[in-house]
From Swiss-Prot:
WD repeats lie at residues 63-93, 105-135, 154-185, 202-233, 246-276, 293-323, 339-369. Keywords: Cell membrane, Endoplasmic reticulum, Membrane, Repeat, Transducer, WD repeat. GO terms for biological process: signal transduction. It comes from Nicotiana plumbaginifolia. Belongs to the WD repeat G protein beta family. InterPro entries: G-protein_beta_WD-40_rep, Gprotein_B, Guanine_nucleotide-bd_bsu, WD40/YVTN_repeat-like_dom_sf, WD40_repeat_CS, WD40_repeat_dom_sf, WD40_rpt. Coiled coil: none annotated. G proteins are composed of 3 units, alpha, beta and gamma. This is Guanine nucleotide-binding protein subunit beta. Guanine nucleotide-binding proteins (G proteins) are involved as a modulator or transducer in various transmembrane signaling systems. The beta and gamma chains are required for the GTPase activity, for replacement of GDP by GTP, and for G protein-effector interaction. One of its GO terms (cellular component) is endoplasmic reticulum membrane. Induction: By auxin. It is found in: Cell membrane; Endoplasmic reticulum membrane. Its main location: membrane.
């Protein structure tokens, strides 16, 4: 058989797979007689409303000299780590707004950062394809810098996202532009498992984000530029447990729902979607029409501790607060008083759900306190 014939057969097989996938998608839509918001409205549910005192800026964290790209809270809720274009990680006391650590990075092109469950170390990664670990309790060197305590090397592309395994300081999962996710043993610096890559059932484009289930740390979900999200079990690296096909653009961000049975995705197609990992079904689409025809991309997201609210950052600088039950925007954080002067770039909620932190291209971070909505956050 000639190369041309092989290519033709491959193209025909690919088209058949795509046709079957579309038929499956349409069949699922037929079987789902309603979505979450439709059912909620039928039960008489009303959307959350926000007044001027329901989400208030209570702290401004100033110290970076470049755009803030990423942030993360400690589980004990009183410290934040942020990564910036200025090539530094800064650890903040969220109660006093003071810096406790300022770490100069070996590579300034950082894209992601994470706090360990104990709060004793932080991790970051970026265009150097390495995930660097810093022990916050280690002594500084003669130049006043914190030395790298461990460099996790093995990716062949940029490190786009990292997250510690819950309740473990010794294991961490990264996603990369090399189309893989990796589970690392931080103690040895070695890869425990590689998800994707040479395996047939992995992503076929850059992996942009990972999120680990808090209720079952063996499960994590990844989002990729191949327009899919995939559910993985850390005990089975050879294939994804389930693949979710619903977006029409790159999946830039994924986040588990608080109960661990669902997760959300955010995409270049301008939508966020909620999926059930048990059935594989899409439960809801969150989309805000824009009259100018230019659809802003979803770049980051976070659920409130109850799951009732979804905070979503868009490429045009908007930061919408969605009522997940009724699929309705209840607030644009970028338009409220005392919001950032630049576009909001990243966001995250404290472990107890009582505070929201946003990072911005204006080099600052802001902490927002909830007023009258503690019952739904």
């Amino acid at each position: 058989m000639s190369v041309t014939e092989l290519k033709e057969r491959h193209m025909a097989a690919t088209q058949t797979v795509n046709d079957l996938r579309e038929k499956l998608k349409q069949k699922r839509l037929q079987l789902l007689d309603t979505d979450v918001s439709g059912y909620a409205r039928s039960q008489g549910k009303t959307p959350v409303t926000f007044g001027p005192t329901d989400l208030v800026c209570c702290r401004i964290l100033q110290g970076h000299t470049g755009k803030v790209y990423s942030l993360d809270w400690t589980p004990e809720k009183n410290r934040i780590v942020s990564a910036s274009q200025d090539g530094r990680l800064i650890v903040w006391n969220a109660l006093t707004s003071q810096k406790t650590h300022a770490i100069k990075l070996p590579c300034a092109w950082v894209m992601t950062c994470a706090f360990s469950p104990s709060g004793h170390s932080v991790a970051c990664g970026g265009l150097d394809s390495v995930c660097s670990i810093f022990n916050l309790n280690s002594p500084i060197d003669k130049d006043g810098n914190h030395p790298v305590s461990r460099m996790l090397s093995g990716h062949k592309g940029y490190v786009s996202s990292c997250q510690y395994v819950p309740d473990e300081d010794t294991h961490l999962i990264t996603s990369s532009g090399d189309q893989t996710c990796v589970l690392w043993d931080i103690t040895t610096g070695l890869r425990t498992s590689v998800f994707g890559g040479e395996f047939q059932f992995g992503h076929t484009a850059d992996v942009q984000s990972v999120s680990i289930s808090s209720s079952n740390p063996r499960l994590f979900v990844s989002g990729s530029c191949d327009t899919t999200a995939r559910l993985w079990d850390t005990r089975v690296a050879s294939r994804a447990q389930r693949t979710f096909y619903c977006h029409e653009g790159d999946v830039n961000t994924v986040k588990f729902f608080p109960d661990g049975n669902r997760f959300g995705t955010g995409s270049e197609d301008g939508t966020c979607r909620l999926f059930d990992i048990r059935t594989g079904h899409q439960l809801q689409v969150y989309y805000q029409p824009h009259g100018d025809g230019d659809i802003p991309h979803v770049t980051s997201m976070a659920f409130s501790i109850s799951g009732r609210l979804l905070f979503v950052r868009y490429s045009n600088g908007d930061c919408y607060v969605w009522d997940t039950l009724l699929a309705k925007v209840v607030l644009n954080l970028g338009a409220v008083q005392n919001s950032h002067e630049g576009x909001i770039s990243c966001l995250g909620l404290s472990a107890d759900g009582x505070x929201l932190c946003t990072g911005s291209w204006d080099t600052n971070l802001k902490i927002w306190a909830f007023g009258g909505h503690r019952s739904v956050i």
